[in-house]
């Protein structure tokens, strides 16, 4: 059984641009435009899916569908369990990188 807290963290704490970057060539084409991260909607094929940075949810302005990280991987033919497992790995890697970048440098001993 997958913990609901893990699903919440995957949806909210792993930025969609990080997920799409991790997918590489397998992921949808994307770009920054007018301060928003946009990508080709995997459902309709239009470059009109835009990520709202406040809630980490993508909305396609062509087909009117919403996507989170899990939905994105499922739309790319991952099954639910494989998607959650992979996204959990990427979330852990992302959080480790974030923690490493925020760690202050220790001053040299006197």
Regions found by a protein language model. Name each.
Residues 1-110:
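N-terminal structured subdomain of primase-like DNA metabolism proteins
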């Amino acid at each position: 059984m997958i913990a609901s807290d893990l699903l919440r963290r995957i949806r909210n704490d792993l930025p969609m641009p990080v997920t799409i970057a991790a997918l590489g060539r397998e992921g949808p084409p994307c770009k920054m435009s007018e301060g928003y991260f946009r990508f080709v909607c995997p459902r309709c094929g239009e470059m009109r899916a835009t990520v709202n940075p406040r809630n980490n949810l993508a909305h396609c302005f062509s087909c009117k569908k919403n996507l989170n990280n899990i939905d994105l991987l499922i739309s790319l033919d991952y099954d639910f369990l494989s998607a959650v497992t992979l996204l959990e790995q990427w979330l852990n890697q992302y959080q480790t990188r974030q923690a490493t970048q925020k760690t202050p440098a220790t001053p040299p001993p006197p």
